[in-house]
A protein has these predicted regions:
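Small-residue-rich anion-binding loops in enzyme active sites
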Residues: 1-12, 140, 147-150
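Patatin-like phospholipase
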Residues: 2, 8-15, 20-116, 120, ...
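Short internal beta-strands
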Residues: 43-44, 216-218
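Short alpha-helical "patches" and their helix-cap loops
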Residues: 66-75, 185, 341-346
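Exposed alpha-helical structural elements
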Residues: 67, 121, 125, 134, ...
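Active-site-adjacent alpha/beta core region of enzyme catalytic domains
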Residues: 85-217, 224-225, 280-300, 305-306, ...
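Terminal low-complexity/disordered tails
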Residues: 219, 225-287, 321-326, 336-364
């Protein structure tokens, strides 16, 4: 039974990486949050993270988990035959092969058709599962990342600023060369994961910045064992690439945010006569007193997975990842590390589960 809404110290942000079938873990995390009465104020996603985010933000509270489950069960029930069957046949509710792209790859067919698969099935699925009116109302804020094909610049489409449509979600999930670019106002976009697969910086760049509990749900393994075969090398390369230097991003944001806290404190120590001068007031605007708790949740490696794990849409794979998301999120919710006292000058506190012990680790 769902409990009453939690009262957390700050806005609740859910940050979702891209990762194809690995996104089932994210759905499990959200189910645990929902059942605990923790409702995100803001969801930020890339690729499958954008799809999950739209299914959450684009439905009323009572429909969010059911819509997620309907989407993921539809993928799993259609994946009989293993990963190679997915490559050659596609998934009826997600993508279907374009035969010409496989047989005549040099044909000048245009950017809108230049992909191995069509995502028209995904578009129809999302249209049936997302309430566009609810999405446009932006009661739960949604931000999705995509890359402009021509400039290579990363762009965040934010429901706070513009009404989001299904095409914005498809653009964020348009991973080349598998999926075609999607045009927004005439400009073609690809999957935001091409540029940055972990869009956590959007929280720190927000204006105005707010104290936040950030559930950062990562589905790729930044660290791993030494590979022993070409197959394992390919899998490890994919993990490193799509983990998207998450540790580095967070370390940089911690340094910047601590400097903001120091600036704020220094400004407060100035005599009133200096503090009120135009120059000091301008410098003080670079200060900030917000506190960011980053709760990192990392999808586990399944015993059977290989370099094709991101297209493992088997019912068992989806079930195991979903259940792992529920389990890990519940453990963090029960621990509630964001309630622990913090140094007022420490603006960013990272909490994560140890992959060795399963216990919560606090990193300041």
């Amino acid at each position: 039974m769902k409990t009453k809404r939690h009262s957390l110290p700050g806005q609740v942000v859910l940050v979702l990486q891209g990762g194809g079938a690995l996104g089932a873990y994210q759905a499990g995390v959200f189910e645990a949050l929902s059942n605990a009465g923790i409702e995100p104020d803001w969801v930020i996603g890339t690729s499958i993270g954008a799809i999950n985010g739209a299914l959450i933000a684009g439905n009323t509270p009572s429909q969010r988990v059911p819509r997620l489950r309907e989407f993921w069960q539809g993928l799993g029930s259609a994946s009989i035959g293993g990963n190679w069957a997915t490559v050659f046949r596609g998934i009826p509710s997600f993508f279907r092969p374009r035969p010409a792209a496989w047989t005549v790859p040099l044909a000048p067919i245009g950017l809108d058709e230049a992909s191995y698969y069509s995502t028209e099935p995904l578009k129809r699925s999302l249209e049936s599962l997302i309430d566009l009116e609810t999405l446009a109302q932006a009661k739960m804020r949604l931000t999705v990342g995509a890359v402009a094909v021509r400039s290579g610049a990363l762009k965040y489409f934010d429901s706070r600023d513009v009404p989001l449509r299904i095409d914005h979600v498809l653009a964020s999930a348009a991973l080349p060369p598998a999926f075609p670019a999607v045009r927004i106002d005439g400009e073609p976009y690809w999957d935001g994961g091409v540029y940055s697969n972990t869009p956590i910086e959007a929280v720190f760049d927000d204006n105005p910045r707010r104290s936040s509990i950030i559930f950062a749900v990562n589905v790729w393994q930044a660290s791993g064992a030494e590979p022993n075969s070409i197959w394992e090398v390919m899998g490890r390369q994919k993990d490193v690439q799509y983990a998207s230097r998450d540790d580095t991003h967070i370390a940089r944001q911690k340094q910047l945010h601590q400097l903001r806290h120091v600036i704020r404190e220094l400004a407060r120590q100035l005599p009133a006569s200096k503090r009120d001068s135009t120059g000091c007031r301008e410098l003080a605007t670079y200060g900030c007193g917000t506190t960011m708790h980053i709760v990192r949740l990392l999808a586990p490696s399944l015993a059977s997975e290989d370099l094709f794990k991101d297209i493992d849409f088997s019912s068992s794979g989806i079930r195991d990842r979903w259940n792992a998301g529920v389990r890990d999120a519940l453990q963090m919710i029960e621990r509630a590390p964001w309630n622990d006292p913090v140094d007022p000058l420490e603006g960013v506190i990272v909490h994560e589960l140890s992959t060795r012990t399963g216990m919560e680790v606090r990193e300041t």
